[in-house]
Regions:
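Short, solvent-exposed recognition patches
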Residues: 63-125, 131-135
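Residue-level detector of functional hotspots within protein domains
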Residues: 9, 28, 32, 114-115
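Sec-dependent bacterial lipoprotein signal peptides
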Residues: 1-21
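N-terminal export/targeting and maturation segments
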Residues: 23-78
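Intrinsic disorder/low-complexity signature
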Residues: 4, 21-22, 35, 83
Length: 135
């Protein structure tokens, strides 16, 4: 009996499933969204949000309401945006006990993010980091 058609069918099925598997990986998902965005524009929007919403002597964290989300950041399809002194956390995916996304440093700022016990950062490009955070 010839098994070549069965191997071909399995190969085709495997290739068809690859994009779906990548969508479930939070890092791949975040990178895909970033590839379709203007990184410099995102950093400029974060700088504007920082000036507008984060006073120098105010809180360390400002959750940003959806009606205030800039157009460029909306294109990332975020779950939530939290503005910190070192940039904007753009949560893109959540799972039980974890949150994943991009941390964008404001244009003109040179913050170097360091991982902590709760949050792990990976630099993707100047001013943009991938993060995994325990909730």
């Amino acid at each position: 009996m010839n098994s070549t058609p069965m191997h071909l069918l399995r190969l085709l099925l495997f290739l068809a499933m690859l994009p779906l598997a990548a969508c479930n990986d939070p890092r791949s998902n975040s990178l895909s969204r970033l590839r379709h965005a203007d990184a410099a524009g995102l950093r400029a929007e974060v700088a504007q949000l920082t000036v507008k919403l984060l006073p120098p002597a105010g809180p360390e964290l400002v959750p940003i309401q959806p009606e205030l989300w800039p157009v460029g950041l909306l294109k990332l399809r975020p779950l939530r945006l939290n503005l910190y002194r070192d940039g904007l956390a753009v949560s893109l995916q959540a799972a039980p006990g974890f949150e994943y996304g991009l941390h964008i440093v404001a244009a003109g700022a040179d913050a170097q993010l360091k991982s902590t016990e709760r949050t792990r950062y990976e630099k993707l490009q100047d001013g943009i980091y991938y993060f995994t955070q325990k909730r």
